[in-house]
Structures are given as structure tokens and as C-alpha cells.
């Protein structure tokens, strides 16, 4: 690339970012004023969903939510780069039992029009509108740990220190820092009656990459990663709560002993006053309600969540099926798993993952419309 082209690209990106920043200027000023004083860490009254150590409530009634991860809901190929196939939003939300919970990607990259380079909230607004119209609840994830459907870059330790506040002018699929995106997103959708909680990062892990592929078996885990991760939740959480004092914040912890949350560190991070709900993600133990060992297993995480005074949502449960296992057997295994987890004290269960184009002739975790797991979701949900 010639120096002139590089210079032009930098200039174009600068003005794009300047235009994007105008969207959040009022919000940023308000946040600056609010965070100059101490922000109350506890959610204020008024949200539809509330949390205690005993679980979740929706509209004041006990709520043990079930539902799906449907990461691609904001995909619209006529606007953004997408993340999976496009979904008929009314058809999807209309197919669920009322007051189900859906976790989906609300990444900055999906708010950028790939043709104009400008912010375009249309596809995301459509998700909230469809959820509201169909009496459903949603859990938006603001950014992924691994960069999938975003910049494809693994978030290392430095990102959690201060990288989340910095804008990378070379990034094709970003017009602002994560900090700015969080402020824009929260200000825009905080009053939606479909909003259950905010999730800052899916499966956070502030480790260090030692090779270009950042393979998990070669990553390094500095001794201060738990402190770094908790500090991130307290800094970002305070800014989020300054904009939205009512709605819950959930930490999207994988829970299996990852860097920063292994062993006792899981409880330390969970005890942040800006974390209201903790998570566990369950894979590879088909039909086993409480997988894992005495240090990082789900039983240990439930105990730690209780000690921290937080409910624990099993936000991902995945099992392979299709060519390798019947859909009916998978549904039976997951039903048994959820029953056992509910008895052990979890606060809800979300399955991985709904797709509009399932591949029944392959071995996948796809869940399409009409899958027997829809019956499990309906049977296991509790409200009232």
C-alpha cells in the first residue's frame, strides 16, 4: 500500500470516527459528570428483571428463564458484515414460549453499515422491537473475547487494563473504542422493556498470547489476571451503571478454570459490586448435570456464586447432534442436565445455539425451529 493511500485511509477513518463520536457526545458528557462522583454499584429500582442470591425475578415474579443463544439476530447482509445467517425476527421470537430469554451479539461491528462506513442501528433496533412485540426478553453481549464476528482479535491482558478505552484507527470494523461503544449501546437501548441484563464481554480471559494463532495451550496467565479482570468490571461497570442505573450486569464467565477465573479467582471476580449475575458455560459432559472437577466444576461455581451473593445463569449448554446423535437423544440429555442444575441451585439455562439454517445431515450444535429442544425450553421455564 502506498504512503498516499495509507494517509488517505487514516484520514477517512479519522473523519468516520469523528462522525461516530458525535452520536455519543451528549452521553459521554453525562457519563463524565456522573462518574466524577461515586456511582451506586447496586441496581436501582425500576428494572423488569432483578437478582438476588436466590435467583431472578421478572416483573416481581420468580423467573427461572430458559431459551437460546441466537448470536446472529442482528445480521442484515444489506447493511452490515453479519454474523451467521439472517433471521426472520418475528418468526423466531414468535416461536418461543412467552418470557423466554435470548442471548445475542450486540457487537459494534454489527452497527456499522459496510457500504457507507457509518453507524447504522437499524438491524439492532429491529431485534429489540421484535422481542418487545413478542413479549420476549433478551441478553445482549457487547463484545466477544475471541473477536469472532468483530475484529477476529483475541483480547489479551492489555485490553482489560486500558485497551478497552482506546480506539484502533486501523480497525476496519470499528469506529470507536469499546468504552465508547458500550456508552452508545447502553444509552440507546437501556429503556427497552425486553432488556434483561447487559453482558460486557463473552467469556473474558485476560491471558497473554505467545504465538500468532493465540492457541489456548500456549497462552500465558500472569499472576495478577484476576485483579485485572475485576478492575475491568469495576471500571466499565461503573460507567455502564452511570448511564443505566437500573438494569443488571452479568459477567459472561465460562467458568471452567480459564485465566483470571480459575479456582478461587472465580469467586473473587464474581464479588465485584458491578457484577449482578454470574455465568457458567457447559459443554462436553452430555447428560451430566454438574460437570467438572472439585476446583472448576459447576458444583463449585454454584457454591462460589452463593458465597458472593449472586445468582448463576448457565448461559450456554451445547451438545453435538445430527449425523452423530439423534435430536431426540440430545433433547433427553439436556432435559436431564437442566433438571439437575435447577435442583442444584442455578438461575436459568440457555442452549447453544439457535440457527435459521440447521444442518441435520452434519454433526453440529445447531438448533433449528421445530427441534425437540423447543419442548425442553417450554417445559423447564418458570415464571410466577
Label the predicted regions.
Residues 360-376, 380-383:
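Short acidic, glycine/proline-enriched helix-loop-strand junctions
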Residues 29-45:
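C-terminal region of N-terminal signal peptides and the immediate post-cleavage residues
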Residues 290-298:
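A beta-strand-loop signature enriched in Asp, Gly, Thr, and Trp
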Residues 281-285:
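His/Asp/Glu-enriched short active-site or ligand-binding loop at hydrolase and phosphoryl-transfer sites
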Residues 46-275, 286-289, 308-309, 321, ...:
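Active-site mouth of glycoside hydrolases
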Residues 314-316:
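Short acidic/histidine-rich active-site segments
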Residues 2-24:
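N-terminal export and membrane-targeting signals
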Amino acid at each position: 500500500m502506498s504512503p498516499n493511500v495509507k494517509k488517505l485511509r487514516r484520514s477517512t477513518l479519522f473523519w468516520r470516527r469523528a462522525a461516530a463520536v458525535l452520536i455519543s457526545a451528549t452521553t459521554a458528557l453525562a457519563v463524565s459528570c456522573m462518574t466524577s462522583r461515586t456511582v451506586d454499584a447496586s441496581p436501582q429500582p425500576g428494572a423488569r428483571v432483578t437478582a438476588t442470591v436466590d435467583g431472578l425475578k421478572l416483573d416481581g415474579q420468580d423467573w427461572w428463564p430458559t431459551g437460546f443463544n441466537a448470536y446472529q439476530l442482528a445480521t442484515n447482509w444489506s447493511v452490515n458484515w453479519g454474523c451467521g445467517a439472517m433471521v426472520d425476527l418475528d418468526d423466531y421470537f414468535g416461536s418461543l414460549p412467552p418470557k423466554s430469554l435470548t442471548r445475542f451479539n450486540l457487537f459494534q461491528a454489527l452497527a456499522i453499515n459496510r457500504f457507507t462506513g457509518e453507524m447504522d442501528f437499524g438491524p439492532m433496533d429491529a431485534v429489540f422491537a421484535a422481542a418487545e412485540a413478542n413479549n420476549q426478553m433478551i441478553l445482549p453481549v457487547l463484545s466477544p473475547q475471541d473477536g469472532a464476528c468483530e475484529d477476529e482479535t483475541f483480547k489479551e491482558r492489555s485490553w482489560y487494563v486500558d485497551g478497552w478505552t482506546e480506539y484502533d484507527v486501523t480497525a476496519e470494523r470499528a469506529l470507536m473504542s469499546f468504552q465508547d461503544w458500550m456508552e452508545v449501546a447502553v444509552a440507546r437501548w437501556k429503556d427497552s422493556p425486553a432488556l434483561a441484563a447487559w453482558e460486557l464481554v463473552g467469556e473474558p480471559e485476560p491471558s497473554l498470547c505467545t504465538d500468532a494463532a493465540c492457541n489456548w495451550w500456549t497462552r500465558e496467565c500472569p499472576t495478577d489476571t484476576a485483579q485485572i479482570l475485576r478492575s475491568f468490571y469495576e471500571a466499565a461497570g461503573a460507567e455502564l451503571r452511570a448511564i443505566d442505573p437500573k438494569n443488571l450486569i452479568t459477567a459472561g464467565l465460562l467458568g471452567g478454570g480459564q485465566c483470571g477465573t480459575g479456582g478461587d479467582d472465580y469467586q473473587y471476580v464474581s464479588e465485584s459490586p458491578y457484577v449482578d449475575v454470574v455465568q457458567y458455560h457447559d459443554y462436553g459432559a452430555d447428560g451430566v448435570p454438574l460437570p467438572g472437577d472439585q476446583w472448576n466444576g459447576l458444583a463449585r461455581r454454584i457454591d462460589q456464586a452463593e458465597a458472593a451473593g449472586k445468582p448463576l445463569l448457565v448461559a450456554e449448554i451445547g451438545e453435538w447432534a445430527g449425523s452423530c446423535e439423534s435430536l431426540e437423544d440430545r433433547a433427553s440429555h439436556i432435559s436431564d442436565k437442566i433438571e439437575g442444575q435447577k435442583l442444584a441451585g442455578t438461575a436459568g439455562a440457555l442452549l447453544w445455539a439457535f440457527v435459521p439454517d440447521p444442518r441435520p445431515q452434519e454433526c453440529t450444535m445447531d438448533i433449528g425451529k421445530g427441534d425437540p429442544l423447543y419442548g425442553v425450553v417450554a417445559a423447564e421455564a418458570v415464571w410466577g
